[in-house]
A protein has these predicted regions:
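A conserved beta-strand element that flanks and buttresses the S-adenosyl-L-methionine
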Residues: 105
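Class I SAM-dependent methyltransferase SAM/SAH-binding core
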Residues: 39-84
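C-terminal alpha-helical "lid/dimerization" subdomain adjacent to the S-adenosyl-L-methionine
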Residues: 139-186
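Short conserved loop adjoining the S-adenosyl-L-methionine
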Residues: 84-98
Length: 212
């Protein structure tokens, strides 16, 4: 178990960005969805201050390990595909889950979905009016952003050696389906007010606030 007060927090670059995603969750949020929760560290972090956290993952063994790791955390663990999942306690199925969550977050999972545009549309529909969507994801390397990709690759190697990388148990998918330019195009077409920002370590942050 890693949910006890004396448990040491593992580290990798995905876990590093959990704090950034948590900072995008409104302080008064009551219901939060973590999409592609993987090993469960972000969901557990959110559960410390949010009363109703749902953690969704399509990989059953990974989800079970997360459930075991954070057995005492008040989290609803859901196995399923975000495009069709039903959410317990929301009083809604896949077709009528519009606006069910005050915040929807996702860390290093969006690139696992084949259709990025459809996935972003689905995530945005799950956000309640005035709520937030925050996604950290990867993009496909491109010549246009070659310097950023190279710098990120060097930085990743250095920080992993210094801090000691904890290997996650979730499946790896590479390369991502979209370049940064393509991802920005998807976001601009669906969520005109959203921001897409490059991060160090080769990640991208998508942040959006739903209209009231």
């Amino acid at each position: 178990m890693l949910d006890g007060p004396s448990a040491k927090q593992p580290w990798n670059i995905n876990i590093h960005y959990d704090a950034l995603l948590e900072s995008r969750v409104p302080l008064d949020a009551r219901r939060v969805l973590d999409v592609g929760c993987g090993d469960g560290f972000l969901a557990a972090r959110l559960a410390r201050r949010v009363s109703d956290v749902t953690a969704l993952d399509s990989d059953a063994p990974v989800l079970q390990r997360a459930r075991n790791r954070f057995a005492t955390a008040p989290i609803k663990w859901v196995h399923g595909d975000v495009m069709s999942a039903e959410f317990p306690g929301a009083g809604c199925g896949a077709s009528d889950a519009v606006g069910a969550f005050d915040a929807v977050v996702s860390n290093a999972a969006l690139h696992h979905v084949g259709d990025t545009r459809a996935a972003l549309q689905r995530l945005a529909r799950l956000v309640a009016p005035g709520g937030t969507l925050a996604v950290v994801t990867f993009v496909k390397p491109s010549f246009r952003n070659g310097l950023w990709h190279l710098t990120s690759w060097v930085a990743c190697g250095a920080v992993n050696r210094i801090k000691g990388k904890w290997e996650h148990t979730a499946p790896v998918k590479w390369p991502p389906p979209d370049t940064l330019r393509q991802l920005r195009g998807h976001v601009r077409g669906l969520l005109p007010d959203a921001r897409v920002r490059r991060l160090l370590f080769g990640r991208v942050l998508i942040s959006w606030r739903a209209p009231d």
